[in-house]
């Protein structure tokens, strides 16, 4: 049994759903043939029980049991709040 906990950091790009946010995860991948580094992004649906995060926040998320068809991550903490001013 694998007890390794997956923890990622990302930026909230959408928070208009109830108890759900969409987090963008950026990673750098090396191209296998051209050996050039490429930026890749992944959009992950995250469960936010208290609706505390807003667009632009940098958050930490943890993998959990499936909550719905698309959500299997939960919000652990907000690392940095986004200020719009």
Curated annotation (Swiss-Prot):
GO terms for cellular component: cytosolic small ribosomal subunit. GO terms for biological process: translation. InterPro entries: NA-bd_OB-fold, Ribosomal_uS17, Ribosomal_uS17_bact/chlr, Ribosomal_uS17_CS. CDD domains: Ribosomal_uS17 (cd00364). Transmembrane segments: none annotated. Keywords: Ribonucleoprotein, Ribosomal protein, RNA-binding, rRNA-binding. The keyword ATP-binding does not apply. Signal peptide: none annotated. GO terms for molecular function: rRNA binding; structural constituent of ribosome. The keyword Ribosomal protein applies. Part of the 30S ribosomal subunit. PANTHER family: 40S RIBOSOMAL PROTEIN S11 FAMILY MEMBER, SMALL RIBOSOMAL SUBUNIT PROTEIN US17M. Belongs to the universal ribosomal protein uS17 family. NCBIfam families: PRK05610.1, uS17_bact. One of the primary rRNA binding proteins, it binds specifically to the 5'-end of 16S ribosomal RNA. This is Small ribosomal subunit protein uS17. The lineage of its organism: Bacteria, Pseudomonadati, Pseudomonadota, Gammaproteobacteria, Enterobacterales.
């Amino acid at each position: 049994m694998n007890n390794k906990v997956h923890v990622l950091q990302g930026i909230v790009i959408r928070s208009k759903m109830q108890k759900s946010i969409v987090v963008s995860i950026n990673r750098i991948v090396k191209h296998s043939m051209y050996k050039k580094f490429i930026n890749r992004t992944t959009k992950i649906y995250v469960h936010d029980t208290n609706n505390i995060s807003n667009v632009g926040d940098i958050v930490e998320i943890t993998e959990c049991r499936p909550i719905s068809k698309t959500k299997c991550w939960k919000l652990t903490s907000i690392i940095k709040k986004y200020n719009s001013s």
